[in-house]
UniProtKB/Swiss-Prot annotation:
Compositional bias of kind Basic and acidic residues: 235-252
Notes on how activity is controlled: Inhibited by GdCl(3), but not by verapamil.
Protein name, entry field: Protein MID1-COMPLEMENTING ACTIVITY 1
GO cellular component annotations of the record: plasma membrane
Molecular function per GO: calcium channel activity
Amino acid sequence: MSHSWDGLGEIASVAQLTGLDAVKLIGLIVKAANTAWMHKKNCRQFAQHLKLIGNLLEQLKISEMKKYPETREPLEGLEDALRRSYLLVNSCRDRSYLYLLAMGWNIVYQFRKHQDEIDRFLKIIPLITLVDNARIRERFEYIDRDQREYTLDEEDRHVQDVILKQESTREAASVLKKTLSCSYPNLRFCEALKTENEKLQIELQRSQEHYDVAQCEVIQRLIGVTQAAAAVEPDSEKELTKKASKKSERSSSMKTEYSYDEDSPKKSSTRAASRSTSNVSSGHDLLSRRASQAQHHEEWHTDLLACCSEPSLCFKTFFFPCGTLAKIATAASNRHISSAEACNELMAYSLILSCCCYTCCVRRKLRKTLNITGGFIDDFLSHVMCCCCALVQELREVEIRGAYGTEKTKISPPSSQFMEH
């Protein structure tokens, strides 16, 4: 399985790299390492190690050194090793993601092998006798001490274990969808699977040309994984389509009910009174429906320190906090609370120095009503640090969500009537 990685020169055109000296080749490797999307850590470590060598070689006249036979052959060997290293790093960007994932440990072995080979050629070159100064010797010692460790990342190892299982499961499809969305951000999942399948077919053809049976089996297994994931994807799309159709039907039925209510005339004052009470009950139903539909906790729509974005609300809350607190408490408790009641509560708790405790309890009730993430300590610290900012954030959240709670029922008297004699 490993000898196909030894023949990486067949994958890219080596002729394009001929004529480049060691310093330029190192520059190409560093540039390719920055754009690699597989084995990123190994590529960057390898590039950092080669930078040390490149900084040393920049001070030498390589063209002059090639005139001497004792330095020409080691330099040419070093350049050949750097060309193979460039092909290795460049393959971490251009080759199939699944293939690179399956061949992970072989690639790690190649990084170690290339680093040892380059260091071996570097020691053969008699640089110390040509450039005899202490700074060069110190850099040689630093290069000897710089031994990088190449391994497979934990996340890539987990994905490799899931994909290379004997049975194709939905777990493999979900993991594959997550990883391919990162590797192909501009493509849909089906298009990314198609691209990977095409690349895997090319890898399979190359392995068959090398008569590598073990690697062919791995690639065929990866092709099966992509086909299984492609079969799972239409089922999930059908489920999403069904859910969307149900939502559209529900919304259309609500619209028809609303239009019917608008068209129906108001016949009597008693019907208007019953409609006002029904609005109160519908407010209860709306809040309970919102609470039941929330499957997961949500976040605050506004930041705690973003109160200055609405200066008028900030000034109103600073000079008249009771009005703001009354609206928040109404939405939190689902019961109409007037500004006077909120003011009485604030005054009562202020006498025992527990004003912040009362307001943080209101914030906690509001979080539970709107299903927002957080804890009691977060609520307490928010009101201790800046109670005004916390109240502004809570009222803005109520306005954004439209959760005004139960408003006080207003009963209007019937219109005046005249009796004819």
